[in-house]
Amino acid sequence: MASVNPFDLLDDDAEDPSQIVASKPLKVVAPVQTAKSGKMPTKPPPPSQAVREARNAPGGGRGAGRGGSYGRGGRGGNNRDSRNNDGPANENGYGGGYRRSEEGDGARRGGPVGGYRGDRRGSYSNGGDSGDSERPRKNYDRHSRTAYGNEDKRDGAGRANWGTTQDDITPVTEESTAVVDKNLTVEKQDGEGEATDAKNETPAEKAEEKPEDKEMTLEEYEKVLEEKKKALQATKVEERKVDTKAFEAMQQLSSKKSNNDEVFIKLGTEKDKRITEREEKTRKSLSINEFLKPADGKSYYRPRGGYQGGREGRGPREGNQRDGGRNLREGGRNQRDGGAAAQAPTPAIGDSAQFPTLGK
């Protein structure tokens, strides 16, 4: 059995693409047809027939725009039938895809036929032993699409432009240099004249220019102060004096008595009465019995002998009695007459035997 060389598919890379194009049969150019005489317009076909013709047209119907000339995934088109999944992997540089054209994309660009190769899973290889999952680099150098570098834009002129670098440097002319030289010579002459004048001045004249110190005696100083005080007193505003002569012609008017004074007097007396009543209430003496009241609201001794039996809690129910504390209540009510004798009398404060004073 003869062995098949698996690397036989790579022989096309060694050939020149121009030779491959020349070896292919040339297309026969169809003769130019002469213009036919005009015919009468025919009746348009029905809509169903027009749809069929559009589908069968070489454009491909719906998929003409998406998959048109290259057929990379269009729904329709001429290249749908040219799919060759079982063909060799180096056809048009795609392992199992669609054909782009008869001559190939590489032939139109002048590049080698073949390019990227990969299996049906989508891996790439550029004729080398790079990894299956690594995409190869492009064969041309990358250039900036904008064609602008990192430098500042200084091109053009006008109001809205930066201008050129030459605009910053003012051109040096002979006239400007001559003007500068003249100014320097004039300044030098002025400086020399001032220096000569300063040398000609004598030290005696310099001493005369110094201000003399003013000296005053004490009497002169006091006179100056008095003059200042007089000037200040003159500036002060004199006090206003009232002339009584202007009021001599005036007459006194009789004032009518009004009832408002009486109303104010009554209101004042009522307030005084309220204050005195409050003071009297506070001064009233309280009876001592109020201080002898037992705490927690318990009953205390009453001279008339009122109700003395206090309520107690319910006792345990015995027999058929609904109210076990009824006997206690009755017993408390019966003690109204003899309650005063049972309790001790209240102490008399005025009795000296009960409250002996110290020192007796």
UniProtKB/Swiss-Prot annotation:
GO MF term set: mRNA binding
Gene3D superfamilies: 6.10.140.1040
One Pfam family cited in the UniProt record for this chain: Stm1_N
Classification via InterPro entries: HABP4/SERBP1-like, HABP4_PAIRBP1-bd, STM1-like_N
An example Gene Ontology biological process: regulation of translation
Swiss-Prot/TrEMBL keywords: Acetylation, Cytoplasm, Nucleus, Phosphoprotein, RNA-binding, Translation regulation
GO CC annotation terms, alphabetical: cytosol; nucleus; perinuclear region of cytoplasm; peroxisome
Domain FF: 223-288
Keyword Phosphoprotein in record: yes
Compartments in which it is found: Nucleus; Cytoplasm, Perinuclear region
Region feature (Disordered): 1-216, 250-360
Residues where Phosphoserine is found: 258
Position of the signal peptide: none
Family: Belongs to the SERBP1-HABP4 family.
PANTHER family (alphabetical): HYALURONIC ACID-BINDING PROTEIN 4, RGG REPEATS NUCLEAR RNA BINDING PROTEIN B
Cited function: Ribosome-binding protein that acts as a regulator of mRNA translation by promoting ribosome inactivation. Binds RNA.
Protein name in UniProt: RGG repeats nuclear RNA binding protein B
